[in-house]
């Protein structure tokens, strides 16, 4: 009898662990991307970092091209890393992670997952803006940036041609999320006062 109770308890624990693992939110960012976000502590750094991750997904899907400014920035960063690599001795302790300027690491994601990554980036931006606003921080610039980003990327999303139902659903979710973010941002911009300070 005691053994049966033990087995039943173990089965219940195993089932609850399996359910919690199944119900866990899927992550559409890589560990390196999460580190990049973690390093961008304040809102003015974090919002552009999320936009960058969303743009990478749109570029990888062929919906967007890198701007000349992005290409030049990546070239300078690559040259800077090359100089630093020559100066430092590369040991396991000092080894740096691979740079995130190349989008080839996104090969591991399906098109539907890339679209979900775009959605996750928008959700994170809106959550970060809401959090900053609740702490009485200035969010006007970030709201304006979000409005511009969604306005620029929504037409690109609508050009995506899904190949199956999973991609079709992910596309619809991405378009819906972008439209909702645009509507929410428009409403927030009518409430949040304009600031006089100039952008850096």
Language-model segments: what does each one mean?
Residues 1-7:
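Positively charged n-region of N-terminal signal peptides that target proteins for export
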Residues 3, 22-23:
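Short, low-complexity interaction segments enriched in Ser/Thr/Pro/Gly
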Residues 8-18:
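Bacterial N-terminal signal peptides
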Residues 23-200:
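Long, charged/polar, soluble alpha-helical segments
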């Amino acid at each position: 009898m005691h053994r049966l109770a033990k087995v039943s308890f173990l089965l219940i624990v195993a089932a609850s662990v399996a359910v919690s693992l199944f119900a866990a939110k899927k992550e559409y960012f890589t560990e390196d991307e999460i580190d990049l976000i973690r390093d961008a502590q304040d809102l003015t750094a974090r919002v552009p970092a999320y936009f960058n991750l969303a743009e990478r997904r749109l570029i990888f899907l062929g919906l967007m091209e890198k701007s000349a400014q992005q290409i030049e920035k990546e070239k300078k960063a690559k040259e800077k890393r090359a100089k630093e690599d020559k100066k430092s001795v590369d040991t396991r302790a000092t080894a740096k992670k691979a740079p995130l300027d190349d989008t080839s690491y996104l090969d591991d994601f399906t098109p539907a997952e890339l679209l979900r990554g775009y959605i996750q980036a928008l959700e994170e931006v809106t959550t970060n803006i809401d959090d900053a606003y609740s702490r009485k921080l200035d969010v006007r610039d970030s709201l304006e940036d979000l409005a511009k980003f969604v306005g620029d990327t929504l037409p690109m999303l609508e050009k995506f041609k899904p190949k199956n139902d999973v991609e079709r659903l992910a596309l619809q979710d991405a378009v819906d999320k972008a439209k909702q973010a645009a509507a929410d941002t428009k409403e927030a911009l009518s409430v949040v006062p304009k600031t006089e300070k100039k952008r850096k």
